[in-house]
Structure formats: C-alpha cells, structure tokens
Amino acid sequence: MSTSSSSAAERDFKREFLKIFFLVFAVLLIGFSIFFLNHHEKNKYIIETLELNGSAEDGDALFKMNCVGCHGITARGLVGPDLHSITKRLNDKQIIKQVTGGLTPPMPSFEIDPINMSNLLEYLHSLE
C-alpha cells in the first residue's frame, strides 16, 4: 500500500512539476517573442529613417516646434544640452534612439515618423 501511495505521490509531483515547467516555458517564450518583435520594429524604423534624404529646412521647423523649450532657439542648450556638433559625438542611430526613446532624462520620448526624423537629423548635421 505504501508503494502504491508513494508512486501516486510521485506521479502527482511529476504532473505538477511538468505543469509549472511548461507554464514558465510559455511565459518566457511569450516574453522573448514580444522583445524580439519590438526590437525588429525599432530596427525597421531606424533603417527606414536612414534610407531617406531629409531636409534641414524642414528639420529646423520641426526643431523650432518641439525642441527649443529645452535646447534653445539656436540649439545651444538651456535645460537640454548644446546640440552643435552632436553628430560628432553620436552617430545617427544613437540620435534616433535618443529622440524616440528619451534615453537620458529629462528628455522625453517622441513619436516621430521616419521622414520627420530624417529631416531632424539633417538639421542636426547642419549645426556642425
């Protein structure tokens, strides 16, 4: 009797273990899938942006609407840093991530379409 009850307990333990194992596996699989899909979308955005030929003039207008409050009308910095020569300190991919992700507080993140991001990059390159 004790043998059958111990083997029943073993089976119950194995079932519970397998349930937990597969649950953890499923959660990890979903988490990794979400991460990689999001990462792919960001790379797609960056690639699309970098393939465009932006306009410094349009980028200047965009800058004046969204950025002067922190970076100043001449982009020399106020609350935010001076952006002259920013393209010598950061590459275009890093700048895109900074603008869209707000990586260094208090910089907010901006949802900006690829053509406007390309325009902003051209404007920043013109500040050198």
Residue ranges and their predicted role:
Residues 35-62:
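Electrostatic cytochrome c docking/interface patches
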Residues 55, 63-69, 74, 103, ...:
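Short pre-active-site segment immediately N-terminal to redox-active cysteine/selenocysteine motifs
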Residues 74, 84-128:
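Extracytoplasmic electron-transfer domains, predominantly the class I c-type cytochrome c fold
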